[in-house]
Amino acid sequence: MKKIKIKILDDRIGTQFSLPSYATSGSSGLDLRACIKDSIILLPNETVLIPTGIAVYIDDPYITAIILPRSGLGHVQGIVLGNLVGLIDSDYQGQVMVSLWNRGSRNFSVKVGMRIAQIVFIPIIRPIFEIVTNFVVDTERKVQGFGHSGVK
């Protein structure tokens, strides 16, 4: 278990809203809440930056955090992240913000304290690059890229 430092920036966290938490014992992501003063109406195709009321300091270059949309909001409501995936570097100490994008066709109400995204902590491999002129082994795929294997 790795300890990650968290700073509470909104007094409602821990009283009105829970700390970021796992919804189930098998959850990978911790839910993040909208720490806003009033509900916000997010119009179709609009993006808005929502504060979460916390800052994290990972302090380990081999760990990063990613912010992901909540699957129900994305699939059912059309609410996803404006930057698709948020990345929190190990040396960042500012407030965790969530860019919400309404890709749906209806207005969406972001309510005070609503669970809007999830944060996942993952290991990072920091490679040392070896410059080569050719790869020693030819793979079956070689340089075939986007769509080369079809959809069947």
Swiss-Prot record:
CDD domains, per database record: trimeric_dUTPase
Keyword Hydrolase (UniProt): yes
Keyword terms: Hydrolase, Magnesium, Metal-binding, Nucleotide metabolism
Disulfide bonds: none
Alphabetized Pfam families for the sequence: dUTPase
GO biological process, one term: dUMP biosynthetic process
Catalytic activity: dUTP + H2O = dUMP + diphosphate + H(+)
HAMAP family in the cross-refs: dUTPase_bact
Protein name in the entry: Deoxyuridine 5'-triphosphate nucleotidohydrolase
